[in-house]
From Swiss-Prot:
Its main location: cytoplasm. Keywords: Cytoplasm. It is found in: Cytoplasm. This is UPF0291 protein stu0508. Belongs to the UPF0291 family. It holds the Pfam family DUF896. InterPro entries: DUF896. It comes from Streptococcus thermophilus (strain ATCC BAA-250 / LMG 18311).
Length: 85
């Protein structure tokens, strides 16, 4: 999300606190917030999918659900062809 949209979200939030929003502004605010949240969720999901967890001995202890996602995306050398990866 670009900085202009974030500035608009903040502007609408400030206006809502001080004088209230028109129905059109409330709809705009809801759409902008939803877009912001969707982008944030994508970024967090992408970050988590890139994590590989290892214990003190160097063994891969990444949860199986995350390993499956990584296999599907070919991350960390994991492959759908190799269920042990």
């Amino acid at each position: 999300m670009d900085s202009k949209k974030i500035a608009r979200i903040n502007e609408l939030a400030k206006k809502k606190k001080t004088e209230g929003l028109t129905p059109e502004e409330a709809v705009e605010q809801a759409k902008l917030r939803e877009e912001y949240i969707a982008g944030y969720r994508r970024a967090v999901r992408h970050h988590i999918e890139g994590i590989k967890i290892v214990d003190e001995e160097g063994n891969d202890v990444t949860p199986e659900k995350l390993r499956q996602v990584q296999r599907e995306k070919g991350l960390h050398g994991r492959s759908l062809d190799d269920p042990e990866s």
